[in-house]
Amino acid sequence: MNTNTDFIIHEPAESYHFRSRSGEYMSSHLLADFRESPALYYKEITGQIDPKESAAFTLGRAAHSLILEGRHAFDRDYIVCNGPVNPRTGEPFGKTTKAYADWLEEQDREVISEKDFAFIMKLQAAVCVHPEAVKLLANGEAEGVVRACCNGVPCQIRMDWFNPEYGLVDLKTCDSQIGRASCRESVFVYV
């Protein structure tokens, strides 16, 4: 068994995504956008479209951080908080209020709500008791980048996890029964 992982590059996610969005490297997400619409792809790599992130994607990134990189990495990048509390009601200000927006602007880490963090903790616990997941994640590297040229096109991937014995591990999160069925089906795409 070859356990050499010298081909894996470690860099911040922001650098990886910038290099995709600038058109320097093709990624699976950009390729999917290109398949959907070459015009969309062009607008993305020329900066005509601001990258937007859904709440589900943010939650997934936070889950990946905690599950694959550990609590130290999670705490480095995220803060668990519902936001500032309205002194009149004793409840957090709504996310659409100026008070919340001002507070959010002052944060040096991404904010994860207490409810979302509880969900992420459940995901982590589920992974920790799943025998196959434990085996796959027992040895390896999280969030490594690999770059190569494919048919003359510079490509890159940011792997969730690389296990030298089992290969690439793609952690999927689901928040519904429909999502779980979809995740189960996607296993066959990768195998």
Q: Which residues does each predicted region cover?
A:
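Metal-dependent nuclease catalytic cores that hydrolyze phosphodiester bonds in DNA/RNA
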Residues: 1-157
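Mg2+/Mn2+-dependent nuclease catalytic core
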Residues: 137-184
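Positively charged, low-complexity/disordered segments
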Residues: 185-191
